[in-house]
Design a protein with these regions (language model features):
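Charge-rich, low-complexity N-terminal segments
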Residues: 1-189
Length: 189
């Protein structure tokens, strides 16, 4: 029997910028979303799997590392995409302690954030549930009006969950910062 449960995390104030946003000239980095702006994000997980001997899909007490991971990336931080042409300036702002920068490999949109979070957290869930459970959906909300989500088929989620490494693109600038999998790895069985 496949059961599902959910867990939500709120109050993740984060700034981001999307370099590809344009103004009426059509030039990248000129639109309003190309500048730092922020939202109070929330992340909502749906877990699926077989219940354990207590009847739980996921023990919510086991999710403290997930909260730590989300707070590291999305709590009072500034996000930038790894392919943003202004990345060196953002890194300089981080080094000057003007922002607490986090570099996301695919982009900072809700869609790309959903993928990033799923890739990092699903192997952890697989590990702490001894392979019984997986993340079937991750929804990222930037506020009450806008959200995006990723839904994953069971066989894909379980196959990815078995992997011990994360498939993140390794940009030169990325290496100066904590790799996301390192945060959760210390908690995995």
């Amino acid at each position: 029997m496949k059961l599902r449960c959910t867990k939500s995390y709120f109050n993740l104030p984060v700034a981001h910028m999307q370099w590809f946003d344009t103004n009426e000239t059509g030039e990248p980095c000129t639109g309003p979303c190309a500048k730092w702006h922020g939202y109070d994000r929330s992340v909502h997980f749906e877990f699926a799997g077989e219940p354990d001997e207590h009847g739980w899909i996921v023990g919510f007490g086991d999710l403290k590392p997930v909260k730590e991971f989300l707070e590291f990336y999305f709590d009072h931080t500034a996000l930038i995409a790894a392919d943003d042409p202004r990345i060196e300036k953002a890194i300089q702002a981080h080094e000057d302690e003007l922002v607490d920068l986090r570099i996301l490999p695919y982009g900072v949109s809700m869609e790309m954030s959903s993928i990033f979070i799923w890739e990092q957290v699903n192997p952890f869930i697989y590990s702490v549930t001894d392979g019984r459970s997986y993340i079937s959906r991750v929804e990222c909300r930037e506020h009450e009006k806008n959200s995006a989500f990723i839904e994953i088929e069971e066989k894909v989620a379980l196959k990815q969950g078995k992997l011990t490494k994360r498939y993140l693109q390794q940009y030169t600038t990325w290496r100066r910062f904590v790799k996301p999998g390192d945060i959760l790895k210390k908690y995995a069985k």
